[in-house]
Swiss-Prot record:
It is found in: Nucleus. One of its GO terms (biological process) is positive regulation of filamentous growth of a population of unicellular organisms in response to biotic stimulus. InterPro entries: Znf_C2H2_type. Residues 1-63, 75-101, 261-307, 492-518 are annotated as: Disordered. Residues 262-274 have a biased composition (Basic residues). Induction: Induced by caspofungin. The keyword Zinc applies. This is Filamentous growth regulator 15. The gene is FGR15. The lineage of its organism: Eukaryota, Fungi, Dikarya, Ascomycota, Saccharomycotina. Disruption phenotype: Affects filamentous growths and leads to hypersensitivity to caspofungin. Residues 505-518 have a biased composition (Acidic residues).
Length: 518
């Protein structure tokens, strides 16, 4: 420490004597001496190399408590040095002065204003230090305008540190990790409106440019970020979709598809097998007994598992699908309407509206008879101790109602057009084939024979699952008229008025989304 000080013993003695003779109790935190003589200049020259190396890294932490700037020597009052200079000038109270603190912060501000970051790590630290100084306000008013200009300039330089060429190496998350708390304080409590609005705009810009995995990891580390994301209406689903679309080619090129399928199949098979065994046993103690089964049962179970995995696979083989649709369109594969026996309608009642014989038309459609109403006699899904008693004007509507609402086993119809157009996201799955037909017609703009072929192929390859494995959510937006009509019909039914004898299934024609229970 003695080798880095350019102070002569004579000057130190004179300065200490002068301080003792003053008699006042003013606190002195730093000693400022000017090297004017030629002997002092000769003492500074041997350590010029150390001064130059320290100035190349303005944002790095100082190892010593002494820093040189121009011709002045600054001694940090917060640390006790072993040299005679600090011992001779230290106040008897041992408390650093306010003047020393202001001068130390002033030197830091000068360095922060004059320097510029070179990478994103320095950029994050630089911005954090400036924001902290502004919020604490432990500086003189001379630096206020300069600090405002510098922090706004740093925020505008954000695009320089965004790696657009290689987004996989993005480190924008470090900005949020280091600066979110202090910038939120500036945005909510700082007195200068320009800096507050710039802080909110800066945080929003950084979040909008983050990758999906960066947002996910930041939310795990700081759950409080979720409130800010809601405030700026950040769409996490849209961020995930962009992540899938942007990086799909990277995943496909680097990882072969068979490897991914085999790994995922093994995990899914193991998970579903454990779940099936636990459901069959009914308790954890009886799980071990389920492993002793017949070979035929194991074979059928494995066959069902592979079929389910093929149904819900993200990238299935669509060659069979393409051939099937092409044959239907060309007429090579003629679809025959299957006969649906009335065995499916054993739990129903036919209600005929009394009407004079003179009013009956001689020509009636075989599919629709306005005088016949079909009533469901199965137990209600909401109230099992009561009958459903839903009424429909057409027989196929009652069949569809019983298959959709009352059946313990559900049929799942997959949209293979979604699979072909966007294989990375996964297929849309419906519980009703008429909803699938509407989805194909509206979303994919496919109609005619091609649409019928798509629906027929999906019905041919439908997956049958138990009722407890899925949860069906109606995704169609219902209008106010829908809810009022339903409430009116429920009121008429509870009052016992049978004048409103017919209920169509138009309100049930909305899109359905299938979610699997874990």
């Amino acid at each position: 420490m003695e080798s880095t000080l350019s102070v002569s013993d004579e000057k130190l003695t004179n300065s200490s004597t002068a301080l003792n003779n003053c008699g006042d109790n003013k606190e002195s935190s730093q000693v400022l001496t000017t090297a004017n003589t030629t002997t002092d200049n000769q003492q500074v020259q041997p350590k010029s190399q150390h001064q130059q190396s320290a100035s190349t890294e303005p944002l790095s932490k100082e190892r010593t408590n002494i820093s040189l700037e121009n011709d002045l020597i600054l001694v940090d009052p917060n640390q006790q040095s072993k040299n005679t200079v600090s011992d001779s000038v230290q106040d008897t109270t041992g408390v650093p002065s306010d003047h020393g603190k202001q001068q130390t912060i002033g030197d830091q501000i000068k360095i922060l204003i004059s320097s510029n970051p070179l990478n994103i790590e320095e950029y994050s630290s630089h911005l954090n230090r400036l924001a902290t100084i502004l919020y604490e306000e432990n500086f003189t008013s001379d630096f206020l305008v300069t600090l405002h200009y510098k922090i706004l300039q740093l925020m505008d330089e954000l695009p320089k540190f965004v790696d657009l060429q290689n987004p996989l190496k993005s480190q924008l998350y470090t900005i949020i990790d280091k600066n979110f708390d202090i910038l939120i304080k500036l945005a909510t409590n700082y007195k200068v409106m320009e800096v507050s609005t710039a802080s909110i705009r800066f945080l929003t810009t950084v979040f909008m440019n983050l990758n999906y995995w960066e947002v996910y990891n930041l939310l795990n580390k700081k759950p409080v970020l979720y409130h800010f994301l809601n405030l700026i209406e950040f769409d996490l689903n849209d961020c995930y979709t962009r992540f899938i679309n942007d990086y799909q080619r990277f995943t496909y090129d680097k990882i072969t598809q068979p490897t991914v399928k085999s790994r995922s199949r093994s995990k899914v098979t193991k998970k579903r097998k454990v779940k099936g065994d636990s459901d069959f046993a009914g308790s954890n103690t009886a799980t071990a007994t389920t492993s002793v089964t017949t070979p035929d049962a194991n074979t059928s179970h494995e066959g069902k598992q592979h079929r389910s995995e093929a149904f819900f696979s993200l990238n299935p083989d669509t060659s069979d699908h393409d051939k099937y649709v092409a044959d239907v369109i060309s007429g090579a594969n003629v679809q025959k309407r299957k006969f649906r026996p009335d065995v499916k309608l054993e739990h129903h009642r036919i209600i005929k509206k009394p009407q004079p014989a003179a009013d009956k038309l001689s020509t009636k459609s075989s599919n629709y008879d306005p005088d016949v109403i079909h009533e469901c006699q199965l137990p209600s899904a909401e109230e099992p101790h009561k009958l459903c008693l839903r009424r429909f004007s057409r027989k196929y509507e009652l069949i569809r109602h019983q298959e959709t609402v009352h059946s313990k086993k559900k049929k799942l119809f997959k949209c293979f057009v979604c699979v072909k157009q966007n294989p990375g996201v996964g297929p849309r799955i419906f519980t009703r084939h008429d909803t699938l037909a509407k989805h194909i017609r509206v979303n994919h703009k496919i109609s005619g024979k091609e649409a019928k072929a798509e629906v027929a192929y999906s019905k041919k390859h439908a997956e049958v699952v138990e009722e407890g494995d899925i949860t069906v959510h109606v995704g169609r937006r219902k209008t106010k008229v829908d809810f009022e009509l339903r409430a009116h019909m429920e009121k008429r039914k509870s009052s016992g008025d049978d004048t409103n004898y017919m209920e169509t299934s138009d309100l049930e024609s909305g899109e359905e989304e299938v979610t699997f229970n874990k």
